[in-house]
Amino acid sequence: MSGERLQKIIAHAGLASRRGAEQLIADGRVRVNGRLAALGESADPAHDRIEVDGELLGAAPPSIHLAVHKPRGFLSSARDERGRRSVVTLVDSKGQRLWPAGRLDVESEGLMILTNDGEWANRMLHPRYGNEREYAALISPPPSGAALARLRSGIELEDGPARLLSARHGPPPREVARSRTERGEWLRIRVGEGRKREVRRLFESVGSDVERLVRVRIGTLTLAGLREGEWRRLRRSEVSALSGSRPR
């Protein structure tokens, strides 16, 4: 069948990310012209009837790209069956379904991006665009110079090798609220990818705990101007810079 891959069509329509669209197909929730769709299938949205959960797939809505300062204790998922607070509830979605482009664990804070543009999110998260992450991390006990050198050189974690691109002493930006009772030392660190709890696992490997972890930058986008729980729309130039292409 000619046309586009089904998961790309679903992502472009704003129903899910590319990976989420693949899961919808695998779960049997997508039909094309009345029959169950298969992974890898192509379709033409101009001529084929595409249904997701029994609802006809409509035209793609206007793309939305938001930056939000996630507080600690909020999930970086669109929904939660246990009713826990989601970062999506912090923003005005204008009735559109949004999901996070990338994640932070529930105890971490800082910059996240919410969008309904699955194709853009897929590009933005791809390593080829070099959107490194920068964090302000409160570490206790403070790691030695030798420990930091080891983390910069790289160590083997259970899911493969990992390393810090850089680590330097320095406080978090002013947008990050601080406590008088905090213990440890603040570091500014850079990593090249966003693997699950990667920063925490790296410091655990040298005998230190991450007391607070605040993401302050993704690629060229920073936390500047966003206090905890605040959000804003990305400018078109910011959207383009993160994905190497113009948004739809």
Where are these regions (language model features)?
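Basic, flexible Lys/Arg- and Gly-enriched helix-loop patches that mediate nucleic-acid binding at interfaces
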Residues: M1-R248
